[in-house]
């Protein structure tokens, strides 16, 4: 309805042609997330891990670990269990619904789950797993839900790509820092989501699954200016 074009295949092909290995990794991981999320935008079958709007994050990391990094399937299963635990804690103590808690509740939790999956699949110590999950969740706090025209397409599809990259970044930091010096615990960040949820609740009708939030508002203004100039 908003004439959105698929970009996953183009992003993947161009990323594979990049001469820098690091950029190829980011580009291909983003493409995996875009591909899965675009399926959700089309109304096709997806895995809600934890939601439809965030359905591109976990599949992107699983695909990257299995098909690119050749991680053993049993390690993936163990990682999925860790991801499920993270998702359960976030749901039990706050929410997974963007309509209730903003996009931090969907992309944020999906990224946190994916970070825990990566760390577990690579046999990281439990503290590193926790730190990775915490970092991924922390850096989505306050993210609003404001889909353009009410469809789970813009900015939702690209946010899945960013959520996947953030998950890998969170694991990279957690696995290389001194784990015991990580200042914020996962539990503290989950509780911080309750504070953010309260702020979003106060502004309900603008930043939580509406067509009156930041992205939709700026889009409408741009269309209005274009109409006036013509």
Residue ranges and their predicted role:
Residues 1-5, 43-49, 73-75, 93-96, ...:
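Flexible, glycine/charged-enriched surface loops at secondary-structure junctions
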Residues 72-79, 88-135, 145:
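Active-site-proximal binding-pocket segments
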Residues 1-88, 95-98, 102, 212:
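Accessory "access/gating" subregions that flank catalytic or transport cores
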Residues 52, 56, 106-109, 162:
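Aromatic- and histidine-enriched alpha-helix N-cap/loop-to-helix transition segments
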Residues 111, 118-218, 222-223, 228:
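Functionally critical mobile loop/hinge segments
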Residues 33-36, 57-66, 83-86, 111-122, ...:
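Buried hydrophobic packing segments
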């Amino acid at each position: 309805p908003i004439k959105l074009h698929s970009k996953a295949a183009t992003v993947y092909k161009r990323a594979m042609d990049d001469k820098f290995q690091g950029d190829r990794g980011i580009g291909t991981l983003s493409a995996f997330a875009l591909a899965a999320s675009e399926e959700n935008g089309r109304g096709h079958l997806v895995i809600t891990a934890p939601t439809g709007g965030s359905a591109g994050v976990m599949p992107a990391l699983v695909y990257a670990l299995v098909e690119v990094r050749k991680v053993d399937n049993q390690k993936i299963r163990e990682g999925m269990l860790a991801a499920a635990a993270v998702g359960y804690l976030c749901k039990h103590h706050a929410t997974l619904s963007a309509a209730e808690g903003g996009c931090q509740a969907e992309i944020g939790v999906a990224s946190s789950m994916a970070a825990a999956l990566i760390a577990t699949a690579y046999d990281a110590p439990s503290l590193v797993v926790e730190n990775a999950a915490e970092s991924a969740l922390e850096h989505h706090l306050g993210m609003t839900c404001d889909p353009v025209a009410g469809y789970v397409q813009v900015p939702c599809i690209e946010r899945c790509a960013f959520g996947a990259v953030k998950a890998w970044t969170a694991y990279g930091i957690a696995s290389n820092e001194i784990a015991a010096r990580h200042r914020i615990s996962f539990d503290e960040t989950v509780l911080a989501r309750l504070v953010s949820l309260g702020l979003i609740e106060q502004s309900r009708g603008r930043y939580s699954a509406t067509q009156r939030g930041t992205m939709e508002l700026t889009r409408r203004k741009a269309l209005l200016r274009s109409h006036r100039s013509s």
